[in-house]
A protein has these predicted regions:
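Conserved glycine-rich cofactor-binding loop
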Residues: 8, 15-17
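Substrate-binding pocket helix/loop in short-chain dehydrogenase/reductase
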Residues: 95-96, 100-108, 205
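Active-site helix of classical SDR
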Residues: 119, 153, 161
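Alpha-helical segment proximal to the catalytic Tyr-Lys
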Residues: 124, 166-170
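C-terminal substrate-recognition "lid" of short-chain dehydrogenase/reductases
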Residues: 125, 213-241
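Short, small/polar-rich loop/turn modules that mediate ligand/substrate recognition or access, typified
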Residues: 169, 174, 235-236
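Short C-terminal tail/terminal secondary-structure segment
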Residues: 235-255
Length: 255
């Protein structure tokens, strides 16, 4: 029997990419999942892919009222859960001098504030001994031009991971983060990116990643499930899944 059979999870930002891959892996193994998103077309497609053990719910991570409503839906449909994967995110790169207050606030509202309050409001529904996994980013500590608000918001989530891990120790709830590098997803993690921008972003990613390729959403999903269910003596950790990019390692010259 699968390790994940009967497990119940909530995946925010779960209608495409890494979130959907994680939800599909759980459902395939006999689990039951609620995924959230804002795009109606993506919600419908995710519901179709996940089938009867999946529940696609419209929810905006930036709105605390939506997070509270999500808690009620989770309690009604799943009761207690084994995993909360806080994956909803927003990225819109731009030079430091061009960042607007609106962009800054939106980025932090979704990536930092939304992540924090999703964990806070749903923690009472997590079983003792369960897991919270946050999505951070290789941008946390890389100093890449144009990534100011995004990098800052994800660095905040890295800090939340440690603090919440400490606070939930009495309940034996482990709190960890997965830190993706360049990953093949429909949006490449960039909100509103044009096809030309995505193509350029992919080329850069392959060039600077030591393993010379993008990761897949399924590789992120495996990392999430490892941290959630198999890494039973690990908490407060950030697992890099980035082809060596975050470790600043270099390929042998000429290879």
């Amino acid at each position: 029997m699968s390790t994940y059979a009967g497990k119940k999870a909530v995946v925010t930002g779960g209608t495409i990419g890494m979130g959907l891959a994680t939800a599909k892996a759980l459902v395939k193994a006999g689990g039951e999942v609620i995924v959230t998103g804002r795009n109606e077309k993506n919600l419908e497609a995710a519901q179709t892919e996940l089938g009867p053990r999946g529940h696609a719910v419209r929810s905006d991570t930036a709105q605390l009222s939506d997070i509270d409503a999500l808690g009620g839906i989770v309690e009604e449909k799943l009761g207690e859960i084994d995993l909360l994967f806080v994956n909803a995110g927003f990225a819109q790169p731009g030079p430091f001098g061009h960042v607007t207050e609106e962009l800054f606030d939106t980025t932090f509202a979704i990536n930092a504030k939304g992540a924090f309050f999703t964990a806070q409001r749903l923690a009472p529904l997590i079983k003792d001994g369960g897991s919270i996994i946050f999505t951070t980013s290789v941008a946390n500590d890389s100093g890449n031009p144009g990534m100011g608000p995004y990098a800052g918001s994800k660095a905040a989530v890295r800090a939340f991971t440690k603090v919440i891990a400490a606070e939930l120790l009495p309940r034996n709830i482990r709190v960890n983060a997965v830190s993706p590098g360049f990953i093949h997803t429909p949006t490449a993690g960039i909100t509103g990116a044009s096809p030309e921008m995505l193509q350029a972003f992919e080329k850069i990613g392959d060039e600077i990643t030591p393993m010379r390729r993008h990761g897949s959403s399924e590789e992120i999903a495996r990392a999430v499930l490892f941290l959630a269910f198999d890494a039973t003596f690990t908490t407060g950790e950030e697992l890099n899944v980035d082809g060596g990019l975050g470790q600043r390692i270099n390929r042998p010259q000429g290879q």
